[in-house]
Regions:
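Hydrophobic adenine-recognition pocket in adenosine-nucleotide-binding enzymes
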Residues: 37
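C-terminal alpha-helical "lid/dimerization" subdomain adjacent to the S-adenosyl-L-methionine
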Residues: 66-115, 119
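Class I SAM-dependent methyltransferase SAM/SAH-binding core
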Residues: 1-23
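A conserved beta-strand element that flanks and buttresses the S-adenosyl-L-methionine
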Residues: 33-34
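A structural motif
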Residues: 10, 57-58, 115
Length: 133
């Protein structure tokens, strides 16, 4: 679903797409949400992204991403071998499983970004989230 679909009746909700590492934002936002993109950044840029999310948010930051481990890599391999066999999907899914951060690495990135008193939790299906209130 495209941004704005379910929130079309709420003019106080807005969306903005930009390169977060270069964007000169004139204002802060209530919520900074980063979903399933952190693993596309190298460690240093991931730290910059987390720092930037904290700077942009007035209230809450939520970062949800893949959690690297054997189950993720085995599951992705099987799914892309048996079901999702398109070459681009196969390549991207397997690369994402390799590049995902482990639970400890995600915590370390948040610490390097200067996050204090943040929460971090594992979820099913090789997911994890960190958040800052």
């Amino acid at each position: 679903m495209l941004p704005g679909g379910l929130s079309a009746g709420y003019p106080e909700i807005s969306y903005h797409a930009a390169n977060i590492l270069e964007w000169d934002c004139p204002q802060g936002y209530d919520v900074a949400l980063c979903s399933l993109v952190l693993h596309h950044f190298n460690d240093d840029d991931a730290v910059k992204l987390l720092r930037r999310c904290r700077e942009l948010s007035k209230r809450f930051v939520l970062v949800s991403d893949l959690r690297r481990g054997f189950l993720l890599q085995a599951g992705v391999y099987l799914l892309t071998e048996l079901i999702f066999r398109e070459p681009m999907t196969r390549f991207d899914a397997r690369l994402s499983a390799q590049r995902a951060f482990s639970f400890g690495e995600m915590r370390e990135l948040a610490t390097r970004a200067g996050w204090k008193d943040f929460d971090h939790k594992k979820f099913r299906f090789a997911r994890q989230a960190i958040w800052l209130e």
